[in-house]
């Protein structure tokens, strides 16, 4: 247990980090249920939590408000803990349209989804790590509170094999089929098995690159090995192996038969209700759909939308909470909720939206009433299942403030950087004054963020600044995550100097180059000008030594007053610490790829100029061969979440395709 978790880092805790770490550890050891880490932007909150995990030696679930932040946290924790099981658990849908019915237009929308195979593998790997290892760190989104396969059924479906044990080949193959693995005679893919004589090759659903080879001699397991399914190279001989099911929703045959009987009983009861209400179309529709599902379950052991029968499959009572990732957590686990001011309300809001959609499906005969139990956890159920919890935020919400038994402040940054100086200026001349400030900041080689209240104003301001010779871009809600990252990358590289937006509070906007944040119409009370939003927005300039914030307002609102008071309190504490310890604030000099996971590297034009000579004299055959090789490398890096490398190779790949088209 001594070195169960080991941090690899060139840095030691500094600033407020040592006291925050000690305070949180003391709270956990004292048995406090809920604590908050109040950490300002750029104070190294992730590093602090990593030290808490290392000290407590307990499996940890970290929840983030969205996939982008979860991916960033996953990358950071994987770098801190390379020897431990750092896993990623988010929704595996690239695209998801839930089934729904619109009574007004009599429109039924079938469930439509595109599943990301790699993320599905990572989800399976996450639950496997929780079952098998004590050193698991799972980074998840709100997907963690949604229904998952019952852990009891899942564990009953494991396939254990040991060298020297008696085991019939047909019995192993039958078990693999029950675990929803499919047989193939071609190349081995994830979730498949292949048979050659007495040799069974299995590519576990939770494995990214390695497959398992079982060699039988008569009815005895003669050899077990890990091998590379691409090259066939044996990597390691094993004394024993455990194969996990292909999906979380596998169920033993006897449970399927029990489920079918219960579904039949509920169907008859529901049909009687609908017929009594003279809802004949709904009754006929429900009978047809349910009977088809029953037939599929009896034949294959599963059906499309099997999760709608999860109440029976997990043997739970009506209204009882569904099994989720929390059911896989050991009792001694830790729960970390990042950006808790966003994540906690998000968790609280999931149940009602899901319920409203499903009630319509039940009322109009598309689903049985038991489908209502295939749902996310209600907030009170989430609270019941939560182990000891640490909330992380620069601006904790009312829930965290009310329920936390201890608040660890992390206001002093390891770099000595001080919160931005805040000025208030009149609204009447805000655009002209802003123009003057922008020109001064650009002359210093820095960047500017401007936040407006409406889309129209953002567009007009962008156009106005552009007409006056300022390189400006507008970040709006229609921009997807990848394009968003590319816009941020261009701002950091100086392709343009000013970024205008409405809500600049989302992830990925902590840029060291930003020296000025301008908040227009700061005195208009509302979500975008609340105390929490103002503090978060002001903090966008906190990574720059010369960081400033200007609030354009004619009156001092309560939110403004509280935000300014809190910012000033932090500044005083930071300055006092720096003075006491003789620290000179240092700017953060991070290269673009360090901060922007998902954005490609370098200037495209420069890259084209550099790469072109290398390929000038290549034949079409050589170019085509190189294009294929680069494509494979690109997808391999993307699968490993090495987005910067993947994007760099993508640029080269596109350049080569362009070159090939010219020949």
Curated annotation (Swiss-Prot):
Helicase ATP-binding domain boundaries: 26-414
Domain named Helicase C-terminal: residues: 430-596
Residue ranges constituting the UVR domain according to the UniProt record: 624-659
Residues involved in ATP binding: 39-46
InterPro entries, per database record: Helicase/UvrB_N, Helicase_ATP-bd, Helicase_C-like, P-loop_NTPase, UVR_dom, UVR_dom_sf, UvrB, UvrB_inter
Notes on the domains: The beta-hairpin motif is involved in DNA binding.
Protein name: UvrABC system protein B
Organism: Legionella pneumophila (strain Paris)
């Amino acid at each position: 247990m001594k070195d169960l978790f080991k941090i690899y880092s060139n840095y030691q805790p500094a600033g407020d980090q040592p006291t925050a770490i000690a305070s949180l550890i003391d709270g956990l050891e004292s048995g406090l249920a809920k604590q908050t880490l109040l950490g300002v932007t750029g104070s190294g909150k992730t590093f602090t939590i990593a030290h808490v995990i290392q000290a407590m030696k307990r499996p940890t679930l970290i929840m983030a408000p969205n996939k982008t932040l979860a991916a960033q946290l996953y990358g950071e924790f994987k770098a801190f803990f390379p020897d431990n099981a750092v896993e990623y658990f988010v929704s595996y849908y690239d695209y998801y349209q839930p089934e729904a019915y619109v009574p007004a237009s009599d429109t039924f929308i079938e469930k439509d989804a595109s599943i990301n195979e790699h993320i599905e593998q990572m989800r399976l790997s996450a639950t496997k790590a929780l079952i098998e290892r004590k050193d698991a760190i799972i980074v998840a989104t709100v997907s963690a509170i949604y229904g998952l396969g019952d852990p009891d059924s899942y564990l009953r479906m494991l396939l254990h094999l040991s060298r020297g044990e008696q085991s019939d080949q047909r019995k192993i193959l039958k078990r693999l089929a029950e675990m929803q693995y499919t047989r193939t005679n071609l190349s081995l893919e994830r979730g498949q098995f292949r048979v050659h004589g007495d040799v069974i090759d299995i590519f576990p659903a939770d494995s990214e690159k390695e497959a398992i080879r079982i060699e039988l001699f008569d009815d005895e397991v003669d050899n077990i090995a890990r091998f590379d399914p691409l090259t066939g190279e044996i990597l390691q001989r094993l004394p024993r192996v455990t194969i996990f099911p292909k999906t979380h929703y596998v169920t033993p045959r006897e449970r399927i038969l029990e489920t079918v009987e219960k579904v039949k009983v509920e169907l008859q009861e529901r049909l009687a209700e609908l017929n009594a209400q003279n809802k004949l179309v709904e009754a006929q529709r429900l009978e047809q759909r349910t009977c088809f599902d029953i037939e599929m379950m009896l034949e294959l052991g599963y059906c499309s939308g099997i999760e709608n029968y999860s109440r029976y499959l997990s043997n739970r009572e009506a209204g009882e909470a569904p099994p989720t990732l929390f059911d896989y957590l050991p009792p001694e686990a830790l729960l970390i909720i990042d950006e808790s001011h966003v994540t906690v309300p998000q968790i609280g809001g999931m149940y009602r939206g899901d319920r409203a959609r499903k009630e319509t499906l039940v009322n109009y005969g598309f689903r049985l009433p038991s489908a209502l139990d295939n749902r996310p956890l209600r907030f009170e159920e989430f609270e019941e299942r939560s182990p000891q919890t640490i909330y992380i935020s620069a601006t904790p919400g009312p829930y965290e403030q009310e329920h936390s038994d201890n608040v660890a402040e992390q206001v002093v940054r390891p770099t000595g950087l001080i919160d931005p100086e805040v000025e208030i200026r009149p609204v009447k001349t805000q655009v002209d004054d802003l123009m003057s400030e922008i020109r001064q900041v650009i002359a210093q080689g820095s960047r500017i963020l401007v936040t407006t209240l409406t889309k129209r104003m953002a567009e007009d301001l962008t156009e106005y600044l552009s007409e006056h010779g300022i390189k400006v871009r507008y970040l709006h809600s229609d921009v997807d995550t990848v394009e968003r990252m590319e816009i941020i990358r261009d701002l950091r590289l100086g392709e343009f100097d000013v970024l205008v937006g409405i809500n600049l509070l989302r992830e990925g906007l902590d840029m060291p180059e930003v020296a000025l944040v301008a908040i227009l119409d700061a005195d208009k009370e509302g979500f975008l000008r609340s105390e929490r939003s103002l503090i978060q927005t002001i903090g966008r300039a906190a990574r720059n030594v010369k960081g400033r914030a200007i609030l354009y307002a004619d009156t001092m609102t309560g939110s403004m007053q509280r935000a300014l008071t809190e910012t000033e309190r932090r500044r005083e504490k930071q300055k006092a610490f720096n003075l006491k310890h003789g620290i000179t604030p240092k700017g953060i000099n991070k290269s673009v790829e360090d901060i922007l996971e998902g954005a490609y590297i370098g200037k495209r034009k420069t890259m084209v100029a550099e790469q072109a000579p290398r390929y000038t004299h290549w034949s079409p055959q050589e170019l085509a061969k190189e294009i294929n090789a680069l494509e494979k490398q690109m997808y391999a890096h993307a699968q490993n979440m090495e987005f910067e490398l993947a994007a760099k190779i993508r640029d080269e790949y596109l350049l080569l395709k362009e070159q090939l088209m010219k020949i």
